[in-house]
Structures are given as C-alpha cells and as structure tokens.
C-alpha cells in the first residue's frame, strides 16, 4: 500500500549559484545538506550542480512523503548510488517517522533535463 508520495523540482541554476558563490557559504550549504558519500559522488562528476540539485530534490520529496515531520535534518536523508538505481536511506527523525507510518520500502526516482532536477519518493508499507 502507498503510504506517502513526495515530488520536488529544483532549478539547477539555483544550486550552481550557491556552488559558484563565496566558498565559505558553499561549504556551509554542502556540509549541512549532503553526507560525505553524496558529496564525493557529486564532486566527482562534471555536472556536479545537476547531481546536487537532484539529491536536494530527493530530500525535499522525502520530507513531503513523510508528512513533513518536525526536526528532520537534511543529513537524515541520504541518497546512495550503489551502481544501479539510486536509493534513499533514512536516519534519525526521518527513520522514526517512517517507522510510525509503517513504511517497509522507500522508492526513489531522479531525473534532470532542461535546467531542472526532479525527484519522486514513494513510501510503501502496510501502515501503522
């Protein structure tokens, strides 16, 4: 049964402006929002702003799917790429919210085209 659905769109230029801005500001943003593995993946790509935008969209979509629980940190939501399709790992308050909802599986899809990155998150389970 579908327990939650979240969708988000991020303008790649918005992330590009942050990355191209003052280095201290860019570093604060990256450290607050992205886990070390996410940063390593994105920084190793030529289109790093697009990759960061897609992951930011995934985090926003996940929060929406979870019903925007209070206190979720960006680092509680990590996009992993194990050679196949990306997956979303929940930790902390995000994982607690998923358990309360009865989530058994998190589905994630990412895409980017025309200067935007889009993510959709579907939460599947039996419910509380």
UniProtKB/Swiss-Prot annotation:
SUPFAM superfamilies: 4'-phosphopantetheinyl transferase (SSF56214)
EC number: 2.7.8.7
InterPro entries recorded: 4-PPantetheinyl_Trfase_dom (IPR008278), 4-PPantetheinyl_Trfase_dom_sf (IPR037143), ACPS (IPR002582), Ppantetheine-prot_Trfase_dom (IPR004568)
Top-level taxon in the UniProt lineage: Bacteria
Keywords: Cytoplasm, Fatty acid biosynthesis, Fatty acid metabolism, Lipid biosynthesis, Lipid metabolism, Magnesium, Metal-binding, Transferase
Main location: cytoplasm
GO cellular component, one term: cytoplasm
Keyword Cytoplasm applies: yes
Its job: Transfers the 4'-phosphopantetheine moiety from coenzyme A to a Ser of acyl-carrier-protein.
Name of the molecule in the record: Holo-[acyl-carrier-protein] synthase
């Amino acid at each position: 049964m579908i327990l939650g659905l979240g969708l988000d769109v991020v303008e790649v230029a918005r992330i590009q402006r942050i990355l191209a801005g003052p280095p201290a500001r860019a570093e604060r943003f990256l450290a607050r929002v992205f886990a070390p593995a996410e940063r390593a993946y994105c920084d190793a790509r030529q289109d790093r702003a697009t990759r960061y935008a897609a992951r930011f969209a995934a985090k926003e979509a996940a929060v929406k799917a979870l019903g925007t629980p209070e206190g979720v940190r960006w680092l509680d939501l990590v996009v992993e790429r194990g050679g196949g399709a990306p997956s979303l790992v929940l930790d902390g308050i995000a994982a607690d919210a998923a358990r309360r909802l009865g989530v058994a599986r998190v589905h994630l899809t990412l895409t980017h085209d025309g200067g935007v990155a889009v993510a959709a998150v579907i939460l599947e389970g039996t419910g509380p």
